[in-house]
């Protein structure tokens, strides 16, 4: 919608400040540990390859990555204690929120999330309460050049892709079925595209437009609070903000 920005777009522009970098590395390290359960060689473990790519994109030191692989592949045991859990809830203005966590204690994680929601005008809901407002899909980010859209369209005809978005003149996001992530990014590479990032994302099917500054700020405060929790690996919301709003 013209004059509005989705939360997913806002997140792309948020820099990782030094105070949050340590927590980010911890979360990325835990993702690597879990992925390494299936094998320590990235060449034969797509999940591990994906986790390592995310870590490198965030400038995580190679020594941290190697240590996480060693722990997850059986040399430390920590990875075996972690499990993926999904939570759903509502924020101010009817905003729907999906949270993916990696935890060794479900009760602790649920309590932390419930507190973050309640302190910021939202509430933690039951599984399925907002999932119908999202589509879990594969997304691959590639490097593009001015005038390359026609070539991209031709490439996608041969791939299992559902569509694309031009983020600017230098990058584009290709999306497709959830189960087709590995084939999609491999296919793009084979077509000669420079693949930068790839992963699974919760894309919104219905957005909530917020035009009130106070409500918008409350929504962003909630999302920031959720993202700051140690067990949280990703936060998705169907928030759409008026670009004219002046918020922090």
UniProtKB/Swiss-Prot annotation:
One of its GO terms (biological process) is regulation of DNA-templated transcription. PANTHER family: TRANSCRIPTIONAL REGULATORY PROTEIN YEBC-RELATED, TRANSLATIONAL ACTIVATOR OF CYTOCHROME C OXIDASE 1. Belongs to the TACO1 family. Its main location: cytoplasm. GO terms for molecular function: DNA binding. It holds the Pfam family Transcrip_reg. This is Probable transcriptional regulatory protein Syncc9902_0542. The lineage of its organism: Bacteria, Bacillati, Cyanobacteriota, Cyanophyceae, Synechococcales. It is found in: Cytoplasm. One of its GO terms (cellular component) is cytosol. Keywords: Cytoplasm, DNA-binding, Transcription, Transcription regulation.
